[in-house]
From Swiss-Prot:
Organism lineage string: Archaea, Nanobdellota, Candidatus Nanoarchaeia, Nanoarchaeales, Nanoarchaeaceae
Keyword Disulfide bond belongs to the record: no
Pfam family, one: ATP-synt_VA_C
GO BP terms: proton motive force-driven plasma membrane ATP synthesis
Family in the record: Belongs to the ATPase alpha/beta chains family.
Protein name (database record): A-type ATP synthase subunit A
Keywords associated with the record: ATP synthesis, ATP-binding, Cell membrane, Hydrogen ion transport, Ion transport, Membrane, Nucleotide-binding, Translocase, Transport
CDD domains with a match to the protein in the record: ATP-synt_V_A-type_alpha_C (cd18111), ATP-synt_V_A-type_alpha_N (cd18119), V_A-ATPase_A (cd01134)
GO molecular function, one term: ATP binding
Length: 570
């Protein structure tokens, strides 16, 4: 019989026979744990629940299985803890606002009936990853995938209403159900990785144009406390051009998950017109939950993302915040007595981060569909210090840095993305898309960067000698810098017209700002800049972002006329 011989917080040492990464039940309360190390007949067990009250000598029960998640209908519009247990079902069963220790509930609802429509017929040969049929889940076509380890001839296939436990087909004598299980630490197989080809449109202008990533790409959002990481992550979750959104609250405040739960059902998806919650999966592993489960929640989100990617959908996984997960790794590592690396983090921090971020990508699935998994990870460096290990190791793995700046946040510049230090490595991939549809945008974007850089340099001079010391040829950069910052880069998350900026609106806004800039440059030397400013055209451009699409188009025409009149006045 396996017995506990030592307890150190979430780390339990037991004597007996175990397999590495096996899920075990610890103590009389049968707490969920995972074997993370074996030494002779001793096993080091990471316990995913509170170990208060656990005693030395209590039994440890083997399950013989790794940590797995059930994948099938019922995942969407649901909220799970870090181990994939549905929080709503836990509350209905226990009437407790806390998760009781040792509770064992399946991820998917066993009673709900789904209408299964077969896409294959009796006698067809199928293999792992093939789509055998579909189920309608809140208007979403949930494609039922053959488990990757199954192949052969379909002996029987049924149509009709089934619970997820009932057999829908028989292949080589094996029953196929609406769901299958998959180990969360094991990436799901695919045929090949494909090149990026299409930008990941978020509805946030500064991300879509200045620092875009491709569908299947990855980005890090580091920033100090109060700089707007969570609001930006929620904005991406709300409006991203993605079929499925998985939002992982990893070690963050419970109120943030509550906000998402309250807001998303009220908001409509711009593509389908249905509540946003219908395409969203929430994984809540808040700061007061056991820290060991933070690691599980990150892999859980990636596995669910890969499952929908394998159905040919585009998926985005939002992890807020990976720093809390790294802190959990640091705590477990120190309890194991491992030699610490920089700032006390384990030496394998980079490998662990890579295991997560490398699961992103655009792939050809086993059933020859194209799917993508985009990963966006928030990082919370203490004091906003980007040189700390989690931020530095993350930047080695991701395709873009969206750096949040508390100075911009205090100036009420939202999203507070520092446009001088942020970057994207994926511009070359998405550039082709813009070249085909909006060729002029590439040049305008470069000009915007040049103006903002020059404005920043001149602001240092202005802070010492004042703006009057500058010539009009220099003042134009301050004038245009303000228009770009306030009229284009800034975005109001709480304004119904400005919260989500369709790409068409973003491009038109860029063009009108650029048109105004070219006109003012032509007039410099003929009219003083002060006189041009008095016309007030720039104020109208700045306010454009608050207009609805219909008003926006009308206002653009009026501003174009004013710019033309200004040019013809000379």
């Amino acid at each position: 019989m396996n017995r506990i011989i030592s307890i150190n917080g979430p780390l339990v040492i037991a004597k007996g026979k175990f397999s590495i990464f096996e899920v075990v039940r610890v103590g009389e309360e049968k707490l969920i744990g995972e074997v993370i190390g074996i030494e002779n007949d001793k096993a080091y067990i990471q316990v995913y629940e509170d170990t208060n009250g656990l005693k030395v000598g209590e039994p440890v029960f083997n399950t013989g299985k790794p940590l797995t998640i059930e994948l099938g209908p019922g995942l969407l519009a649901n909220i799970f803890d870090g181990l994939g247990r549905p929080l709503k079902d836990i509350y209905e069963k226990t009437q407790s606002i806390y998760i009781p220790k040792g509770i064992d509930l399946p991820t998917l609802d066993r009673k709900k009936v789904w209408e299964f429509i077969p896409k294959k017929k009796k006698g067809d040969t199928i293999k792992g990853g093939d789509i055998i049929g579909t189920v309608n889940e809140n208007g979403f076509e949930h494609r039922i995938i053959v488990p990757p380890n199954v192949e052969g001839k379909i002996e029987e296939i049924y149509e009709g209403n089934f619970t997820i436990e009932e057999t829908i087909a028989i292949v080589n004598g094996k029953p196929i159900k609406l769901y299958h299980e998959w180990p969360i630490r094991k990436p799901r197989p695919y045929k090949e990785k494909l090149d990026y080809n299409y930008p990941f449109i978020t509805g946030t202008r500064v991300l879509d144009i200045m620092f875009p990533i491709a569908k299947g790409g990855s980005a890090a959002v580091p920033g100090p406390f109060g700089s707007g990481k969570t609001v930006l992550n929620q904005q991406i979750a709300k409006w991203a051009d993605s079929d499925i959104v998985i939002y992982i609250g990893c070690g963050e405040r419970g109120n943030e998950m509550t906000e998402v739960l309250e807001e998303f059902p009220k908001l409509k998806d711009p593509k389908t017109g249905k509540p946003l919650m219908y395409r969203t999966i929430l994984i809540a592993n808040t700061s007061n939950m056991p820290i060991a489960a933070r690691e599980a929640s990150i892999y859980l989100g990636a596995t669910i993302g890969e499952y929908f990617r394998d159905q040919g959908y585009s998926v985005v996984v939002n992890a807020d915040s990976t720093s809390r997960w790294a802190e959990a790794l640091r705590e477990i590592s120190s309890r194991l007595g491992e030699i610490p690396s920089e700032e006390g983090y384990p030496a394998y921090l980079l490998r662990k981060l890579a295991e997560f971020y490398e699961r992103s990508g655009r792939v050809r699935t086993l059933n020859d569909l194209e799917g993508s998994l985009t990963i966006i990870g928030a990082v919370s460096p203490p004091g906003g210090d980007f040189s700390e290990p989690v931020t530095q190791n993350t930047l080695r793995l991701v395709g873009a840095l969206w750096a949040l700046d508390s100075k911009l946040a205090y100036k009420r510049h939202y999203p507070a993305i520092n446009y001088l230090i942020s970057y994207t490595k994926q511009w070359e991939f998405v550039k082709k898309y813009f070249e085909e549809l909006y060729e002029d945008v590439i040049e305008i974007r470069e000009e915007f960067f040049a103006i903002l850089k020059r404005e920043s340099e001149l602001m240092d001079i202005v802070s010492i000698v004042g703006p009057d010391a500058l010539s009009d040829n220099e003042k134009i950069y301050l004038h245009m810098g303000r228009i770009i910052r306030e009229g284009f880069l800034q975005q109001d998350a709480f304004d119904e017209n400005d919260s989500y900026s369709p790409l068409e609106k973003t491009i038109e806004l860029m063009r009108i700002i650029h048109k105004y800039y070219v006109t003012v440059k032509q007039l410099l030397g003929k009219i003083p800049l002060e006189e041009i400013e008095q016309k007030g055209i720039h104020e109208k451009i700045i306010k454009l972002r608050y207009k609805s699409l219909k008003e926006f188009r009308e206002e653009i025409k009026a501003i174009e006329q004013e710019i033309l009149s200004l040019l013809n006045s000379q």
